[in-house]
């Protein structure tokens, strides 16, 4: 009788532990960024520190023998984007600094 009681409690404890682990793993992925420091984990799956947005890779099919363009060494989000005057009449353009 004592053995059945022990195994029953052990099975219940194991089920509760597995449910708790499942719950924590699902809610952890939905936490905001500042909670990552609290949990001690970094979720930087899609972060590429040395790549620019929207630029082709250094090797391309149309330029054999060349190493491609040299990318910016410092990332500047809108550093080289200059737009002309807007045709809609709502402004929207900025002129490049001399």
From Swiss-Prot:
Region Disordered, annotated ranges: 50-98
Positions of disulphide bridges: none
Tissue specificity remark: Mostly expressed in leaves and seedlings shoots, to a lower extent, in roots, but barely in flowers.
Residues spanned by motif SxS motif essential for MIK2 binding: 58-60, 86-88
Keywords recorded for this protein, A-Z: Apoplast, Cell membrane, Cleavage on pair of basic residues, Membrane, Repeat, Secreted, Signal
Biased composition (Gly residues): 86-98
Bias (Polar residues) ranges: 52-61
One Gene Ontology cellular component: plasma membrane
Main subcellular location: membrane
Motif window: SCOOP motif 2: 80-94
Motif SCOOP motif 1 mapped to chain: 52-66
Signal sequence, start to end: 1-29
Record keyword GTP-binding present: no
A GO term, aspect molecular function: receptor serine/threonine kinase binding
Localisation per UniProt entry: Cell membrane; Secreted, Extracellular space, Apoplast
Function field: Brassicaceae-specific phytocytokine (plant endogenous peptide released into the apoplast) perceived by MIK2 in a BAK1/SERK3 and SERK4 coreceptors-dependent manner, that modulates various physiological and antimicrobial processes including growth prevention and reactive oxygen species (ROS) response regulation. Inhibits root growth and regulates root meristems. Promotes ROS production and MAPK (e.g. MPK3, MPK4 and MPK6) activation in a MIK2-dependent manner, thus leading to the up-regulation of immune-related marker genes (e.g. WRKY30, WRKY33 and CYP81F2).
Family: Belongs to the serine rich endogenous peptide (SCOOP) phytocytokine family.
Binding partners and assembly: Interacts with MIK2 (via extracellular leucine-rich repeat domain); this interaction triggers the formation of complex between MIK2 and the BAK1/SERK3 and SERK4 coreceptors, and subsequent BAK1 activation by phosphorylation.
Protein name: Serine rich endogenous peptide 10
Organism in which the protein naturally occurs: Arabidopsis thaliana
Gene field: PROSCOOP10
